[in-house]
From Swiss-Prot:
InterPro entries: Leucine_aapep/pepB (IPR011356), Macro_dom-like (IPR043472), Peptidase_M17_C (IPR000819), Peptidase_M17_leu_NH2_pept (IPR023042), Peptidase_M17_N (IPR008283). Keywords: Aminopeptidase, Cytoplasm, Hydrolase, Manganese, Metal-binding, Protease. Presumably involved in the processing and regular turnover of intracellular proteins. Catalyzes the removal of unsubstituted N-terminal amino acids from various peptides. It is an enzyme of class 3 (hydrolase). Mn(2+) 2 binds at K267, D272, D290, E351. Its EC number is 3.4.11.1, 3.4.11.10. CDD domains: Peptidase_M17. Belongs to the peptidase M17 family. The gene is pepA. GO terms for biological process: proteolysis. This is Probable cytosol aminopeptidase.
């Protein structure tokens, strides 16, 4: 679906559907008043009958409104006089998108500029959320359905903005389109079945991306190279599977050669049975989403490539399949990491930190400005923060603050958890330098503490997306595409875009 921005009068546009906001109590904004005047009071007459209360997201479709070039007018409730919050604004946009998808027209014009959104002064923030919501609503994953979804009639949406805000709105749509592309790619990878999406498949996806973009270099390290580098923890996770592990390195050079890169590290466990520490059978199908950290790094890179941001970015995808077998890692095994630290593996289901710790050590060679790892790491994060907010930890307050701010701006929020030294003691092992679990308490924090021991050479942050990477059960089940908006916003901010 194509999104464009124009600065024209709503009453003059020729379109299949014109969308106009109406407030509670039959209050008309400037656009609605102009449409009402052009239609000789048709809008007011409908509202007087009480057909639309004007609550946010309520809709009423009118056909053949006199005095207008639009075939239909869709009235949408915009609430009371005060500004809408992000959530209400997104719900309004999703409601409009839902109605438009059910209509026969190939285009629509949204005249929603009169609506104010709290904390979104100017046009950029408001139009960015609007565009992202509209584009996200167009996502369909039916690759394995014998009956595909009906082709959508709606091909183009025009967003109206006043002349003063036109440039900001256009920039917002440009950024939103890139983010939506990245989110769709992330969701596609996450939704693929694990018999298709394994480490070698992700490596092929990376190579395909490299062929499509000249400025992107791709290197794939196989299990032999992983072992040669001394990545004992990484190798241990995949040794029970017939699908060999892969470390995928993608290097984008959009900035000056002398500029230090940002590094994104993604956990890519393409299926997690728990290994010998086997998970319960109920809901295990959702462990195909354990690679959503890597998928979100892929998606963020897609957005960066589309926008051609003037930064240097290295993406490291730590991909393995965690399976039980005669050759699998056992609880009690001790491995030596690339850093030289030894790890006692008390629970083979705490495998994400094992592939990440060696990858974080590998990241040192790029002399990064900052390293951010993204992982569906702990069920404890879902207990602590639910499915609305990602967990965030780090060793640098400025970096953590930048990510928190990016999350707010992108409406893809994170919440900081502590990394106090007292938590480190829970990882003590009588037999190795460190244990891979820290007991039943503060599981998200102790996982972050584990990773912090391998990230002392640079500014580092860790995003635990166990609660936000996918939606469980119901008709909306599937990968969410998060935290692509947060990560892309962080990089947009660093690029000054």
């Amino acid at each position: 679906m194509e999104l464009v921005v124009k600065s024209v009068a709503a009453v003059s546009v020729k379109t299949a559907t014109l969308v106009v906001p109406v407030g509670e109590g039959r209050k008309l904004g400037a656009t609605a008043k102009a449409v009402d005047l052009a239609s000789e009071g048709a809008i007011s007459a409908v509202l007087k009958r009480g057909d639309l209360a004007g609550k946010p997201g309520q809709t009423l479709l009118l056909h053949s409104v006199p005095g207008l070039k639009a075939e239909r007018v869709l009235l949408v409730g915009s609430g009371k006089d005060e500004a809408l919050g992000d959530r209400a604004w997104r719900k309004l946009a999703a409601s409009v998108a839902g109605v438009l998808k059910g209509l026969g027209g190939s285009d629509a014009v949204l005249a929603l500029d009169d609506i104010a959104v709290t904390g979104r002064d100017g046009h950029y923030g408001k139009y960015r959320l609007l565009a992202e919501t509209l584009l996200d609503s167009d996502y369909v994953f039916d690759r394995y359905k014998s009956q595909k979804a009906e082709p959508r009639a709606l091909k183009k949406i025009t967003l109206l903005a006043d002349k003063a805000g036109l440039a900001e709105a256009e920039r917002a749509v440009k950024h939103a389109s890139a983010i939506a592309t990245g989110m769709a790619f992330t969701r596609d990878l996450g939704n693929l079945p694990p018999n298709v999406c394994h480490p070698s498949f992700l490596a092929e996806q990376a190579k395909g991306l490299g062929k499509a973009h000249k400025g992107l270099k791709v290197e794939v390290l196989d299990e032999k190279k992983i072992k040669e580098l001394g990545m004992g923890a990484f190798y241990a996770v995949g040794q029970g599977s017939d699908q060999p592990p892969r470390l995928i390195v993608l290097n984008y050079q959009g900035g000056k050669k002398s500029e230090k890169p940002f590094v994104l590290v993604g956990k890519g466990i393409t299926f997690d049975t728990g290994g010998i520490s086997l998970k319960p059978g109920a809901g295990m199908d959702e462990m195909k989403y354990d690679m959503c950290g890597a998928a979100s790094v892929f998606g963020t890179l897609r957005a960066v490539l589309e926008l051609q941001l003037p930064i240097n970015l290295v993406c490291l995808l730590a991909c393995a399949e965690n399976m039980p077998s005669g050759g699998a890692t056992r609880p009690g095994d001790i491995v030596t990491t690339m850093s030289g630290q030894t790890v006692e593996i008390l629970n083979t289901d705490a495998e994400g930190r094992l592939v990440l710790c060696d990858t974080l050590t590998y990241a040192e060679r790029f002399k990064p400005q900052a390293v951010i790892d993204i992982a569906t790491l702990t069920g404890a994060c879902i207990v602590a923060l639910g499915s609305h907010t990602s967990g965030l930890m780090g060793n640098n307050d400025e970096l953590v603050g930048q990510l928190l701010d990016a999350g707010k701006r992108a409406d893809d929020r994170a919440w900081q958890l502590p990394l106090f030294d007292e938590y480190q003691e829970q990882l003590d092992s009588p037999f190795a330098d460190i244990a891979n679990i820290g007991g039943p308490k503060a599981g998200t924090i102790t996982a972050g503490c584990f990773l912090s021991r391998f990230a002392k050479a640079y500014n580092w942050a860790h995003l635990d997306i166990a609660g936000t990477a996918w939606i469980s059960g119901g008709k909306d089940k599937g990968a969410s595409g998060r935290p692509v908006p947060l990560l892309t916003q962080y990089l947009l901010d660093r690029a000054g875009a």
